[in-house]
Amino acid sequence: MPSNVSSAERPTFPKRAVITGGMPYGNKNLHFGHIGGVFVPADFFARFLRDRIGSQNVVFVSGTDCYGSPIMEGYRKKVEGEGYDGSIVDYVSANHEAQLQALEAYGISLDLFAGSGLEPA
């Protein structure tokens, strides 16, 4: 059966790609919306491109957003409600580590998970 698809109509792929996942706030651990709504689709696409153009040509990055009112409010509640005595940097760093562990537990293939206000990765 002859095909009507010419080689010009075949999909083309970039030579290199950077895939990003939306950065969750550093005020708590990840929930299902983060994992299933942001990271799984981005991970799927990163894996697909790694298969097509080579893993050395694809970088999948995300991180913790360390700024914003949700972080300030979460920190305030933790200090006032639970007697937390760490700094806001300690608070965000702990949540960043929890987020990273959650992503690793789900097998998300990030190349870099950094923090916008934390020390360089």
Task: Give the location of each predicted region.
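N-terminal, positively charged nucleic-acid-binding surface of large information/translation enzymes
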Residues: 2-121
